Amino acid sequence: MGEENQPNYTISQENWSLHRKGYDDQQRHQEKVQEAIKNNLPDLVTEESIVMSNGKDVVKIPIRSLDEYKIRYNYDKNKHVGQGNGDSKVGDVVARDGSGGQKQKGPGKGQGAGDAAGEDYYEAEVSILELEQAFFRELELPNLKRKEMDENRIEHVEFNDIRKTGLWGNIDKKRTMISAYKRNAMGGKASFHPIHQEDLKFRTWNEVLKPDSKAVVLAMMDTSGSMGIWEKYMARSFFFWMTRFLRTKYETVDIEFIAHHTEAKVVTEEEFFSKGESGGTICSSVYKKALELIDNKYSPDRYNIYPFHFSDGDNLTSDNARCVKLVEELMKKCNMFGYGEVNQYNRHSTLMSAYKNIKDENFRYYILKQKADVFHAMKSFFREESGEKMA
């Protein structure tokens, strides 16, 4: 086919800067939302609208560090024109508060009753996916190892091939333009135009099978009478994010839910997050149930095992020595054992007093005293560590 009969593709020369103004403003707003999410993440992860959302796609959450757009009054009243010297950047504050440089207390702060209006906050619609991306970026299962008899494989799609035909949505613009430039240069005219059919390059994908180790997480929660509404909410908030993290980041992680008071039993996920119980507390019962599950269902030769237990620490004193013995037995079969204690008022904890004597490096604990500690507990239990790569 002669060059005159070749179908030509052109590169648009139109100045699209004006068309992008709305898009640029939207991107700037999204950047501010993402920055606000990152700065407020410890408080956001325990927002009731999120924890009680059952994983819905979009939730409304208050972000107090994000102001709505407004015009501010110029207190200085200086004569000026609207042209700057070019040193300002996007996001710079150009208004002043008229306080003469003195730091003022915000509304609703300080001693005595005031007459100032309250501080408004911005209620943003944020997808669970956005929060997960910000939250889970630095988390991973610790000490994950390749196990024997590992036949498990996951399918992974990678854009790792370039072809001359494909979907228009997958066209590789850079490679297409380079191909056209080379062809035109060989003809004596180094230019990106015209682009012919033979210059087109499309990205395409291949399905890659990767070996993957199996893992099981044992979620154990104290549901006794001493665990009040706040304590159970904190424990369930942690396990809510833990299950989201595991299912988002790992293809093959089983989760077993175990609730206990004086007795322990395996429950469904729905019962674990909604059912309330009462009674006394014997924590050794849940460790026995965990060992029973491991012996019957999850061999340490085939599974990476991670037990996590949340309680208020108010255990039967005579049961503490038994708990320590069972935890040490669990750690011989597990990659890591995590204990979270919800202790808002820093009271004496019989269980933590016993656990502080455990010196094993695979035993991790965290005391939660406020809502933001759910975030910090997740970071502590699932922290990334160099050298903890799957062997």
Curated annotation (Swiss-Prot):
Region described as Disordered: spans on this chain: 1-31, 80-117
Residue spans of biased composition, Gly residues class: 98-115
Ranges of Basic and acidic residues composition bias in the record: 21-31
Biased composition, class Polar residues, residue ranges: 1-16
InterPro entries assigned to the protein according to its UniProt record, in alphabetical order: Spore_YhbH, UPF0229
Family affiliation: Belongs to the UPF0229 family.
Protein name, per record: UPF0229 protein BC_0551
Lineage, opening ranks: Bacteria, Bacillati, Bacillota, Bacilli, Bacillales
